[in-house]
Amino acid sequence: MLINADVNDDYVMLVGVSSDALNALAEFTKQVYQDLEINVKSITINTQVSLVDAVLMLRGMIEGNAPCDVVIGIAGDRWVTTVLSFLAMALVTVGGFVNVSVDKVFTMPSDKGEPVDWPIVPRLIDLSPVEFRVLRLICSGYSLAKEIVKGYASRFNEAISLPTVERTLAKLRSKRLVNGKPVGKALMHETTELGKLIACG
């Protein structure tokens, strides 16, 4: 991945499951980009972690460099290909909310032919800004509608009504981004794996 950050230095992020192969590739990449002063970071993905956790780690690193533009080149084994594909789709889904733009995604064929550009990077789901903010609050531990109203005002400096939060939670449940568990007369919310993939971290 090539991360072109507005604030921090530009860098190439190499992702794989073998640290030896990544180190060799990192040395090669440093030579290719030596005149451009681009940093190279090698990230080894543990194949024992879940898909969601692997994507969360990478998404968090990229969002930590926002605002930025990202180019994702996909090659390697099935695990890396799957993780990077979901990363691309997650970033496109929430990029507008976190100042990350996915400029290009391409796949390198195993026969070492020409790269194949993705004609479109699909969104995992459509979200409004309010839905994304509420989902982020749930990731942060706000689980009841009344808590979310208070958390929304303190985190985003913007008031939101309880009925609006309740409608938003209903939409998030229908999109299978959160689950609601009855606690007395209220519903306690937690993210699903998909909700975690796109908003937590």
Q: Language-model features: where?
A:
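Long, low-complexity, Lys/Arg-enriched
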Residues: 1-69, 83-86, 90-201
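Polyanion-engaging groove/track-forming segments
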Residues: 79
